[in-house]
Amino acid sequence: MGVTELGKLIGKEVRREVKLESLSGKCIALDAYNALYQFLASIRQPDGTPLMDRAGRITSHLSGLFYRTINLLEAGIRPVYVFDGKPPEFKLAEIEERRKTREKAMEEVLRAIKEGRREDVAKYAKRAVFITSEMVDEAKRLLSYMGVPWVQAPSEGEAQAAYMARKGHCWAVGSQDYDSLLFGSPKLVRNLAVSPKRKIGEEVIELTPEIIELDAVLRALRLKNREQLIDLAILLGTDYNPDGVPGVGPQKALKLIWEFGSLEKLLETVLKGAYFPIDPLEIKKFFLNPPVTDQYATEVRDPDEAALKDFLIREHDFSEERVSKALERLRKARGKLKTSSLDSFF
């Protein structure tokens, strides 16, 4: 999911940069699909194509998930990955549009490969990223073998993750997107499940984890409650109405919320008669009351090293030397988690 326009209103004053180690002892509910997309887009071979095993199966997501999760465990973080379930009906049209966009990008990839344009291959390949049900199943298998808990959400993963954070079972939600704030997570941690370095043009920038607190966002934007934040996001555009209200940018949307107080009042006045492909009040209702489950666990268990070796080395052709070294790191990280105080969770 993504509410990028809302992110433009969240200034530096509410983005608290921290070191990874400062999150030691914290349980963080990670948006699994968001993380997998990041891995598939960023972990590439020099020609722009994803990592693959001998059978031609993509393994970028497994490589990213395996090594990045070990990094989190070494920092003392207790990750819980939350997977998307069935999307709401009003999201299906947007999902179809994204599928078409990815297909067009893939056509550009094939054309660039044929014409030998290596830079364009890398550029379009990132836009053509897709996640299959097989990739999801493989990710769940990998996490299970690692002893890392995962949760199957009934609907949106970020809604489930936010619910777990609101209940106090996780300290925060980890995602690059801001939707978890709309779903009510008290805290959002960005830049957790991504590479610590990112190339923008010719420049390589360092990405450090940043904490964004819901209450701090509301204060900074002078909003009374989460409902007003949801109203603001709907005006700007969400996954369910990506275009928002035409002609309404971040500052104008904020002023409208300040002046009229709610989306309902706006629909009765300045937006009366405006066309919306999706009923904005249905979107608001979903953000306030999404389907969630109480069937989840957050405890990190001992890894099954034999199963991990079989899965990564024999099934997917990972380097035996690299996997063995990583398993040693995983073993030590698990040992540290066992001895850490439970008080740090709170």
UniProtKB/Swiss-Prot annotation:
Keywords from the named record: DNA damage, DNA repair, DNA replication, Endonuclease, Exonuclease, Hydrolase, Magnesium, Metal-binding, Nuclease
Chain intervals for the UniProt region annotation (N-domain): 1-102
EC number: 3.1.-.-
Keyword Chaperone attributed: no
Source lineage: Archaea, Thermoproteota, Thermoprotei, Thermoproteales, Thermoproteaceae
Start and end residues of each stretch annotated as I-domain: 120-261
Cofactor(s) annotated in UniProt: Mg(2+)
One GO molecular-function entry: 5'-3' exonuclease activity
Entry protein name: Flap endonuclease 1
Chain positions recorded as Mg(2+) 1 binding sites: D31, D84, E156, E158
Cofactor binding note of this UniProt entry: Binds 2 magnesium ions per subunit. They probably participate in the reaction catalyzed by the enzyme. May bind an additional third magnesium ion after substrate binding.
Subunit structure: Interacts with PCNA. PCNA stimulates the nuclease activity without altering cleavage specificity.
Keyword Transmembrane helix: no
